Amino acid sequence: MTDKELNKREEKLAGEGIAIRHPIFLWFENLWYHHKWTIIIVAFFLFVAIVCFAQCATTPHKDIYITFGGSYTMTGEEHQAVERVFDELSKNTFSENIPAVGVVSYPFYTEEELRTLFTDPETGDFDGAAFNMAKGQNANRLEELSSYMMTGECSIWLVNTSVYEAQHMNEKLAVPLAETFGTTPIGAYDEYAIRLGDTAIYQYYEALQVLPADTLIVFTRSYFMGASSNEKTYEQFKALYRAIVEFEAP
């Protein structure tokens, strides 16, 4: 039976008070019933990819970048709001040649967080297939983040503990807090990192509070020292990092 004939049959039966569903609607209902959570999570990660691409494609060049690699996907508005906070801080930190600050985002979720995402809160059913697919995408994102770390383009990182430990940042990349501040601040996560939620800047700026409080702030060494321009940029990174950690509410 053709679609045209089927539509006429539906109209006729509907006129007689009999509701006949088009097969395409039945197919979608069946797909949703059996694969609801897979569809939701796939759509979620597609949203993550689209947001990341949009942020990269629409963000103008900045002088220095802060990289977020944590358990949250910022919307476009949230991303811009976070950038404005650090850009304002830059203006208050530098008296001349004020660097424009950009934020690069690599959303990365822990395995426990992924398991929660793929578990139906009503039934407790776990979608193992969708979980494994998302886990693979997560691994790819971590690899991309790792490659970006090696470029030396960024020295200020906001990462979750999984990224911090997976990249061995305290062994290979991070500058000891005592080297920057003269001593390790009380309450620091370890000798290299401070929790974002413990800083005054996080408490003061509501825009930053979309990021998880247990996000770690890490300052890393530059791989490409030598050229005067690189050294100048690194010193700007260092000054901004200190301003973030030592921020005092007005």
What is each of the regions a protein language model found here?
Residues I64, E96-P99, T151-S155:
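Loop/turn elements at helix/coil->beta-strand transitions in domains of secreted/extracellular proteins
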Residues W32-A57:
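Hydrophobic membrane-insertion alpha-helices, especially the h-region
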Residues T58-S71:
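Alpha-helical transmembrane signal-anchor/signal-peptide segments
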Residues F118-G197:
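Extracytoplasmic "Venus flytrap"/periplasmic binding protein-like
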Residues M1-A19:
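N-terminal intrinsically disordered, acidic low-complexity segments at the extreme N-terminus
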